[in-house]
UniProtKB/Swiss-Prot annotation:
It is a multi-pass membrane protein. One of its GO terms (cellular component) is membrane. Residues 63-82 have a biased composition (Low complexity). Its main location: membrane. Glycans are attached at N124, N173. Residues 60-90 are annotated as: Disordered. Keywords: Glycoprotein, Membrane, Signal, Transmembrane, Transmembrane helix. The chain crosses the membrane at residues 244-264, 275-295. It is found in: Membrane. It comes from the Eukaryota. Residues 1-25 form the signal peptide. The lineage of its organism: Eukaryota, Amoebozoa, Evosea, Eumycetozoa, Dictyostelia. This is Putative uncharacterized transmembrane protein DDB_G0288661. The keyword Magnesium does not apply.
Length: 307
């Protein structure tokens, strides 16, 4: 199967947009290093892969050691060791750790400094009060001692949307030329995002690239035939396709994290953390499929779902 760069971009769009939303969701404390979201994702992907790859081997070792548990001390030691490996690599712990990392990054988990400071007060609050406070955190515009904005998720996304409007110009309102290379053309006329990127690919380059602007006539005809869309609706899709894609993604993103904020209000047990971890992975899968289905059409109208 011929390898196509464009198919890779379909997946990277999701990573880039979520990275752009995550990377500046809030200003970190002076003593706290900025989170490398791409490294975080890769680390949990590796953990999950290692778990799936080693599960059978660990299970077999545990069964053998359990059968020989009373034979000698060596077997007992091996059993304890393998049981510990299974516990460390279990799917529950993997997703629970993932959920805890998400909570800590959003500054609403047990590891968040604000959560620790207000823990005693929140113990006396109802679940609804905790949920309300967490949701208000989405719109957080508090000032720190350094008089910097401690941004919530939504203010950060709003600023990112404002940045999208200005792609093509840098901070000095000048064309950025080809200082930041594009994935396909190795040149770019769009500004480098100050919010970070993944794999050296700028999110503004992707949004402004022909990838999002290319819905061919054959693809539109395919949609028209399958769903009976009128020419007027097709024209609206052409005109507002980028806005529609972004809006759907934003709604999915927002509702998912409202659920996470609610779960964080209930408590921070291993079950809650596990659900949050699974929910976050589910969010990634859904948005990846969304972009693949909406944009993934060849010019002959065939789907390009295989990556």
């Amino acid at each position: 199967m011929k390898f196509q760069k464009r198919n890779i971009q379909l997946v990277l769009i999701l990573l880039l947009i979520l990275n752009n939303c995550f990377i500046n969701s809030q200003v970190e404390n002076s003593k706290k290093e900025k989170v490398d979201v791409s490294a975080l994702i890769q680390s949990y992907g590796s953990e999950l892969f290692n778990y799936l790859n080693n599960w059978n081997k660990v299970e077999e070792n545990n069964n053998k050691n359990n059968n020989n548990n009373n034979n000698n001390n060596n077997n007992n030691n091996n059993n304890n060791k393998n049981s510990k490996v299974k516990n460390d690599d279990s799917i529950v712990n993997t997703f629970s750790n993932y959920g805890n990392q998400i909570l800590n990054y959003l500054n609403i988990g047990d590891g968040g400094e604000k959560q620790k400071q207000n823990q005693k007060e929140k113990e006396n609050q109802s679940v609804f009060s905790k949920f309300s406070n967490n949701v208000l955190g989405l719109f957080n515009f508090e000032k720190t001692k350094d008089k910097k904005e401690d941004e919530g998720i939504l203010p950060s996304i709003i600023k990112n949307i404002q940045d999208y409007v200005k792609w093509g110009k840098n901070e000095n309102n000048e064309s950025s030329g080809d200082k930041y290379p594009n994935f396909e053309t190795q040149s770019s006329s769009f500004s480098h995002s100050p919010y970070g990127d993944i794999f050296g690919i700028n999110i503004n380059d992707i949004i402004a690239s022909p990838l999002l602007n290319e819905i061919s006539d054959s693809s539109l005809n395919y949609l028209k035939q399958q769903f009976g869309l009128s020419n007027q609706i097709i024209q609206l899709l052409i005109q507002f396709r980028n806005t529609i894609i972004f809006a759907i993604t934003f709604i999915i993103f927002l509702f998912t994290y409202l659920i996470i904020y609610y779960l964080a209000s209930i408590g921070n047990s291993i079950v809650i953390s596990f659900i949050i971890g699974v929910l976050t992975v589910f969010l990634w899968v859904i948005i990846t499929l969304l972009f693949t289905i909406v944009i993934g059409y060849k010019k002959n109208g065939e789907k390009t779902l295989e990556l």
